[in-house]
């Protein structure tokens, strides 16, 4: 099983967050399922902004090392085409969300987890389920 994590989940995992209990539940479920966590190169870019703004080379190195162990999905030509399809059919879909969903779609994932409940209403080819963190943490 492949589970795509949207950027906000990494923030909840690595920073002191009220969503910590939900993240722990999701991690426990993923371990039971022997799930592979995947994300896109956009996630890494988004996560590095704040540490770079604060000149925190230690956090840049820490995040980079963590992502070196993970499968990162590239925003390639196929993802760019899928991105355009998503944006053309879902007018309110923000560009970063469309980019993440396009990467997940072209890579083929079983579950896409985000904290944006609006995304969980979408059905995207190549993505089995889209769930908000609260819903994903309660999966059987």
Regions found by a protein language model. Name each.
Residues 2, 72, 101-140:
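Acidic, PIN/NYN-like endoribonuclease modules and their adjacent C-terminal/linker elements
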Residues 1-39, 51-62, 117, 131-140:
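Short, well-structured N-terminal submotif of metal-dependent ribonuclease cores
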Residues 69-90:
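Acidic catalytic patch
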Residues 10, 44, 80, 119-120:
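A generic structural signal for short hydrophobic patches within well-formed alpha-helices
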Residues 38-39, 74, 95, 114:
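Short beta-strand scaffold positions
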Residues 50-52, 124-125:
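Short, well-ordered secondary-structure micro-motifs
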Residues 7, 41, 97-101:
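Conserved glycosyltransferase catalytic-site signature
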């Amino acid at each position: 099983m492949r589970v795509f994590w949207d950027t906000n989940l990494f923030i909840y995992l690595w920073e002191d967050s009220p969503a910590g209990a939900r993240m722990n539940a999701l991690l426990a479920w993923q371990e039971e399922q022997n799930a592979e966590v995947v994300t896109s190169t956009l996630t890494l870019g988004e996560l590095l902004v704040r540490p770079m703004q604060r000149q925190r080379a230690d956090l840049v190195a820490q995040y980079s090392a963590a992502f070196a162990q993970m499968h990162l999905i590239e925003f390639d030509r196929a993802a760019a085409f899928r991105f355009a399809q998503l944006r053309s059919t879902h007018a309110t879909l923000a560009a970063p969300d469309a980019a993440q969903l396009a990467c997940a779609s072209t890579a083929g994932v079983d579950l896409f987890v985000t904290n944006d409940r609006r995304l969980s209403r979408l059905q995207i080819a190549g993505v089995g389920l889209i769930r908000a963190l609260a819903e994903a943490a309660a999966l059987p």
